[in-house]
C-alpha cells in the first residue's frame, strides 16, 4: 500500500516553469508547500510553489 505520501511538482513563481518533483504527507501538511530553490531558467534562487 502506498500510504499518505503524494507526489507533487514545484513551479517557479516568476517564470512558471516546473523544475522539481518531491513528495509530501497529505495528512500532516495540508496547505500548499513553498520552498526556495534554484531555477535554471531564471538562473537564481526563487520561491517555488506546489502544483499538481
Swiss-Prot record:
Matching entries from InterPro entries are given as: Ribosomal_bL33 (IPR001705), Ribosomal_bL33_CS (IPR018264), Ribosomal_bL33_sf (IPR038584), Ribosomal_zn-bd (IPR011332)
What the entry lists under PROSITE patterns is as follows: RIBOSOMAL_L33
List the Gene Ontology MF annotations in alphabetical order.
structural constituent of ribosome
Q: Record's superkingdom?
A: Bacteria
- One record GO biological process: translation
GO cellular component entries: cytoplasm; ribonucleoprotein complex; ribosome
- This chain belongs to which protein, by name? Large ribosomal subunit protein bL33
Q: Which SUPFAM superfamilies match?
A: Zn-binding ribosomal proteins (SSF57829)
Q: Which organism is it from?
A: Anaeromyxobacter sp. (strain Fw109-5)
Q: Which family does it belong to?
A: Belongs to the bacterial ribosomal protein bL33 family.
- Name the UniProt key words of this record, in alphabetical order: Ribonucleoprotein, Ribosomal protein
| PANTHER family named among the record's database cross-references | 50S RIBOSOMAL PROTEIN L33, CHLOROPLASTIC, LARGE RIBOSOMAL SUBUNIT PROTEIN BL33C
Amino acid at each position: 500500500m502506498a500510504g499518505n505520501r503524494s507526489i507533487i511538482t514545484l513551479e517557479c513563481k516568476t517564470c512558471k516553469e516546473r523544475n522539481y518533483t518531491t513528495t509530501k504527507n497529505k495528512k500532516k501538511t495540508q496547505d500548499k508547500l513553498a520552498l526556495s530553490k534554484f531555477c535554471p531558467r531564471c538562473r537564481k534562487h526563487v520561491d517555488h510553489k506546489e502544483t499538481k
